[in-house]
């Protein structure tokens, strides 16, 4: 016998849980949420809380925080701290155990949420579409596996997230993804992270801090520079600082084959013919929408050419009662975006009028060492979007690094404006506290702040953030897409 619900959600990640909670508490609807695992770890990794909580933002931030102590300990000597450096060692097992405990606490809090919230029910298993109003809960991902439950659904939200992409090359079975990296029993002595995106860059910093004596971290990327899609100035400066921190960066390189050495290490052959022996190869070449087990074809849900579920601005699919949110839509793969989409889509379904998520001016961060904070358009994007663009740029050594021994750690601040009216359309930061600073900047940009609002604001001294209140003169411009050091005519 099937159970009837106002809303069935496939996927218990950040977006799905937000949607379920709001529907049950704000609209008093009967809601079912389906997912394959309740607590973090193998075999399926993404449990209650989704990628972010289990194998993404949360554990990654904890591990990056741990990694930052390496530099802080070294730099403390400049501030008068004296200790025997030979007695200091990093304990990877302690880090992983603490990380696991913190994630488990969050998993348990979500379990309690289901127990304590009237109208909200969790089903353990693989959710798939049988009809446009019927979701099956199976024992496995295989559509032939045993059906545990059939759920009647007036409305359905698909929120199954994304999954690490792996290269299709010989020997890929000898590699791990970021999922497994969170559960390594020992820090790798020699490690190759494949990819130039934020996951690869962040793990390179983690591994570099915790590597055993004599270890080496290498990052390879098929293009140049790393972090495609981010501000070009920041990409270049971050590369310099990663190299200064001891990370090898191989650009315009991509593995073509992975072989297992007799001692268990990996022999990597690159497309250029170069080779490298490492203990661990971690693939971090991107993430793909997780749709394979959903049986979308049974009801004709359309996909994009990249395999994401196709939705409109209100997260509606082409099937009237079926919606999709978060990574599975291939829009902006960020947890706060999925949460906002989850809240918006529930308002659309059960509220008085449709509500959409604003995907513009979304602040985000890369928790590299040093970190990046970014919001809005890059230089290149702004030059294509506006007739006249002004770029304000500052690169300086933060006060602490004048005595920390790390003068190479520059702070970069860039403000990009529509020079027609002075509206700030992009802000990009590199350096300590950039992710914290950019959140406040995002609020300013949401309110359509102008460059004059920034420089007429009195800064907090001495901070790196105050630089945003001091930038009055553009470093260069773009006129109809052409870069110029000065304006050709004062009337512009």
Swiss-Prot record:
State the compartments where it is located.
Cytoplasm
Query: Impact of altering residue 21 to R?
Result: KM=600 uM for trypanothione
Q: Is the keyword Cytoplasm assigned to this protein? A: yes
| Cofactor(s), by name | FAD
Q: Which Pfam family, giving just one, matches this sequence?
A: Pyr_redox_dim
Catalytic site: 461
InterPro entries listed in its UniProt record: FAD/NAD-bd_sf, FAD/NAD-binding_dom, FAD/NAD-linked_Rdtase_dimer_sf, GSHR/TRXR-like, Pyr_nuc-diS_OxRdtase, Pyr_nucl-diS_OxRdtase_dimer, Pyr_OxRdtase_I_AS, Trypnth_redctse
- NCBIfam families assigned: trypano_reduc
SUBUNIT field: Homodimer.
- Name the record gives this protein: Trypanothione reductase
Native source species: Trypanosoma congolense
